[in-house]
């Protein structure tokens, strides 16, 4: 899992007012695990590559399928998301991200699929056939709901 991918989540109180007083024990200051705890339910991607298939999951709950672009270019898969300014609970916000991951050489790029669940989880998967490396080409992958 990659824990540094927040796709437009709000700020937390401790992001704005960290403990800065020198009289406070260091044990009560920002925890090393704070980012892990805060990210447990937002903006995380998970990459898995096992013997049968390669899978990537992204939390893109703030984007609709037409605001997402998924492409395979050479040995990489690229995902981009962008939406214009819209109103939320705290005012107006626009979001944009771009991620790029290297595909294992055994993934059959022509069989890669991508789907978006109702709760905003984007899943890309491709089989790892036993035949070894496959031909490489550039192509766009449609995001299906």
UniProtKB/Swiss-Prot annotation:
Annotated spans, Disordered: 124-145
UniProt family annotation: Belongs to the small heat shock protein (HSP20) family.
Lineage start: Eukaryota, Metazoa, Chordata, Craniata, Vertebrata
Official protein name in the record: Alpha-crystallin A chain
Intracellular or extracellular location(s): Cytoplasm; Nucleus
Binding partners and assembly: Heteropolymer composed of three CRYAA and one CRYAB subunits. Inter-subunit bridging via zinc ions enhances stability, which is crucial as there is no protein turn over in the lens. Zinc coordination is achieved at least by His-83, Glu-85 and His-90. His-83 and Glu-85 come from the same molecule within the oligomer, while His-90 residue is provided by another molecule. Can also form homodimers and homotetramers (dimers of dimers) which serve as the building blocks of homooligomers. Part of a complex required for lens intermediate filament formation composed of BFSP1, BFSP2 and CRYAA.
GO molecular function, one term: structural constituent of eye lens
Binding site for Zn(2+) 1: 83, 85
Keywords (A to Z) from UniProt: Cytoplasm, Eye lens protein, Metal-binding, Nucleus, Zinc
Major localisation: cytoplasm
Pfam families with a match to the protein in the record: Crystallin (PF00525), HSP20 (PF00011)
GN (gene name): cryaa
Protein source organism: Oryzias latipes (Japanese rice fish)
Residues that coordinate or bind Zn(2+) 2: 90
GO CC annotation terms, alphabetical: cytoplasm; nucleus
sHSP domain boundaries: 35-144
């Amino acid at each position: 899992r990659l824990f540094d991918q927040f796709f437009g989540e709000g700020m937390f109180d401790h992001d704005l007012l960290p403990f800065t007083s020198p009289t406070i024990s260091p044990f009560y200051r920002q925890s090393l695990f704070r980012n892990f705890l805060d990210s447990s339910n937002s903006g995380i991607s998970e990459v898995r590559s096992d013997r049968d298939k390669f899978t990537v999951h992204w939390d893109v709950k703030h984007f609709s399928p037409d605001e997402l672009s998924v492409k395979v270019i050479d040995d990489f898969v690229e995902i981009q998301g962008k939406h214009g300014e819209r109103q939320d609970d705290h005012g107006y916000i626009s979001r944009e991200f771009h991620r790029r991951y290297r595909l294992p050489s055994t993934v059959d790029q022509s069989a890669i699929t991508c789907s978006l669940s109702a709760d905003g989880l984007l899943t890309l998967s491709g089989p790892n056939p036993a035949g070894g490396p496959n031909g490489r080409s550039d192509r766009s992958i449609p995001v299906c709901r």
